[in-house]
């Protein structure tokens, strides 16, 4: 019995066996990603694919300053509103910036025909040559060119008029019929603008043009219109009951434009030879101009980013990330970040069998922790880590390259009568935007799922690599760990890690230790059986003695009567 108890004590005493464990890296990162199956998975490393910041400024685009219209609108600038005089010297720009509520547009009230189409045309223009299409001093000798001014277009407190148009009036009591032509010899498209005056009453018509009935005719290869003034009293706008309607056309190289009129013509003075440039555009923004450079400009501000997506603004100019409605697009590159909880021990499970990562292993993603008589330590498996890094890096770069198509996305122009078309266009744009957003989010979710599964697989492979080497020279003790049946010094540990473990060398020692341990288990089972029998017999005897004592006491005091019948 003493011998058996000694064996039991030996079995219950702790033994310091050499161990090696497979694990993975963990750190203090708080990055979270989403996958197809999970949300907010904490990971060790990730990359952001979504730009959500801007500088709040208008910047030079690729070193070229924008044309900032300030208080002027496109109409005021291109017609030559005298309050926009500072803009007339601008010949080139990277893009045009207009404020939402421009004060200086058409100073003389009236309708600007096809204004939205003109804006669309100008959005692709990066420079122009402003030139006199009909020189003021010699083109109209039979008409007055100085009295055509108005208080509604005042400048510095004096009546004035557009700087790119001439209001022709009667001279010496007459307004002779006029015919003027221009041949486009600029080898570029030429933008020509003019107007037709509609007086508020017949008296003004006679006073200004010396006739009641007048017409204006404009003809080119692609344009042919005849205008008749509409004389009618109208509500005052900017102090005027009359109106001027504004028109424009693009004259192709070599084409001729002919103006004929016997009154009411607001004649072209300056025209524009257009140079179109890829990447130009018009944005509506309240942002201020700053001394900065960018490759991507939005109405909110400049974006300087190489990321494939942005959620700053759908309207962009330059080389810009694609706009999506997402609030988060983060792609995982590392592993699930689950640092080991000390109370559970060092290890715990990725891939279902290691519960936590190691913050102590900093030189790789996957690796080993060993413990023997010489000490303990971490070591990364450099080969599997490097292969994983290369594979994931190539995948991330491929995703960014495929999705990082640079865009210029400008708003489309519609007039008030095209509201239904504008609404339809918005629905179409919203549909495309939803598709882009869905595709981007789904791509990231799928790739995140694949990356985390890839890491799990790598840890499993490393575990199986060790298991296949050790065979029955060690036993699996859970949590990714093996306990050797033999002594394994640092040299032995290193051979396991690099795949050169000599199984036969340690087989005999392992076999003997396995047999000893199995013997201890058998002896332990015998001891446990003896203890169990002893415990059962002792308990029964105590129960019988207790029952007899109670019965004797109850018989002695009369509580229990005992009769023996023969």
From Swiss-Prot:
A lipid is attached at residues 555, 562, 565 (S-palmitoyl cysteine). The record marks 344-345 as: Cleavage. GO terms for molecular function: host cell surface receptor binding. Keywords: Clathrin- and caveolin-independent endocytosis of virus by host, Clathrin-mediated endocytosis of virus by host, Disulfide bond, Fusion of virus membrane with host endosomal membrane, Fusion of virus membrane with host membrane, Glycoprotein, Hemagglutinin, Host cell membrane, Host membrane, Host-virus interaction, Lipoprotein, Membrane, Palmitate, Signal, Transmembrane, Transmembrane helix, Viral attachment to host cell, Viral envelope protein, Viral penetration into host cytoplasm, Virion, Virus endocytosis by host, Virus entry into host cell. GO terms for cellular component: host cell plasma membrane; membrane; viral envelope; virion membrane. Residues 551-566 are cytoplasmic. SUPFAM superfamilies: Influenza hemagglutinin (stalk) (SSF58064), Viral protein domain (SSF49818). Pfam families: Hemagglutinin. Binds to sialic acid-containing receptors on the cell surface, bringing about the attachment of the virus particle to the cell. This attachment induces virion internalization either through clathrin-dependent endocytosis or through clathrin- and caveolin-independent pathway. Plays a major role in the determination of host range restriction and virulence. Class I viral fusion protein. Responsible for penetration of the virus into the cell cytoplasm by mediating the fusion of the membrane of the endocytosed virus particle with the endosomal membrane. This is Hemagglutinin.
């Amino acid at each position: 019995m003493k011998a058996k108890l000694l064996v039991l004590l030996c079995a219950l005493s702790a033994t310091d066996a050499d161990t090696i464990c497979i694990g993975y890296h963990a750190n203090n990162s708080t990055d979270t990603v989403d996958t197809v199956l999970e949300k907010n998975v904490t990971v060790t490393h990730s990359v952001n694919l979504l730009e959500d910041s801007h500088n709040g400024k208008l910047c030079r685009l690729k070193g070229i300053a924008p044309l900032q219209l300030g208080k002027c609108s496109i109409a005021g600038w291109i017609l030559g509103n005298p309050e926009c005089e500072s803009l007339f010297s601008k010949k080139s720009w990277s893009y045009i910036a207009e404020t939402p509520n421009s004060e200086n547009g058409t100073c003389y009230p009236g309708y600007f025909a096809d204004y939205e189409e003109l804006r669309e045309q100008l959005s692709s223009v990066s420079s122009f040559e402003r030139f006199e299409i009909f020189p003021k001093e010699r083109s109209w000798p039979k008409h007055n060119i100085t009295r055509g001014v108005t208080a509604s277009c005042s400048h510095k407190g004096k009546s004035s008029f557009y700087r790119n148009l001439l209001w022709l009036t009667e001279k010496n009591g007459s307004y002779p019929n006029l015919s003027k032509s221009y041949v486009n010899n600029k080898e570029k498209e030429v933008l020509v603008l003019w107007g037709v005056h509609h007086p508020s009453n017949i008296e003004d018509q006679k006073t200004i043009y010396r006739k009641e009935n007048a017409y204006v005719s404009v003809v080119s290869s692609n344009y042919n219109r005849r205008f008749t003034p509409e004389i009618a009293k109208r509500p005052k706008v900017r102090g005027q009951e009359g109106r001027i309607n504004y028109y424009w056309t693009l004259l192709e190289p070599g084409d001729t434009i002919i103006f004929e009129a016997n009154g009411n013509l607001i004649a072209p003075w300056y025209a524009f030879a257009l140079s179109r440039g890829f990447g130009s555009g018009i944005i509506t923004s309240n942002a201020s101009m700053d001394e900065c450079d960018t490759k991507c400009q939005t109405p909110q501000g400049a974006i300087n980013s190489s990321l494939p997506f942005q959620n700053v603004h759908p309207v962009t100019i330059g080389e810009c990330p694609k706009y999506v409605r997402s609030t988060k697009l983060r792609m995982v590159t590392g592993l699930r970040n689950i640092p080991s909880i000390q109370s559970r021990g060092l290890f715990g499970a990725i891939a279902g069998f290691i519960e936590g990562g190691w913050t102590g292993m900093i030189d790789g993603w996957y690796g080993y922790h060993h413990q023997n008589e010489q000490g303990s330590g971490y070591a990364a498996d450099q080969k599997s880590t490097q292969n994983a890094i290369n594979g994931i890096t190539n995948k991330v770069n491929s995703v960014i390259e495929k999705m990082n198509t640079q865009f210029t996305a400008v708003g489309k122009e519609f007039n008030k009568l095209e509201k239904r078309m504008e609404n339809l266009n918005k629905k179409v744009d919203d549909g495309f935007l939803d598709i882009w957003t869905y595709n981007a989010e789904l791509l990231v979710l799928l790739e995140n799922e694949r990356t985390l599964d890839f890491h799990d697989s790598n840890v499993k492979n490393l575990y199986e690599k060790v298991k296949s080497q050790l065979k029955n020279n060690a036993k699996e003790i859970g949590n990714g760990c093996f306990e050797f049946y033999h002594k394994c010094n640092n040299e032995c540990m290193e051979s396991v890690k690099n795949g050169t473990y000599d199984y036969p060398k340690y087989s005999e020692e392992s076999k003997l230790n396995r047999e000893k341990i199995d013997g201890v288990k058998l002896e332990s089972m015998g001891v446990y059986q003896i203890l169990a029998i002893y415990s059962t017999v002792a308990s029964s005897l105590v129960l019988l003695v207790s029952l007899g004592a109670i019965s004797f006491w109850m018989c002695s005091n009369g509580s229990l009567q005992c009769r023996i019948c023969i």
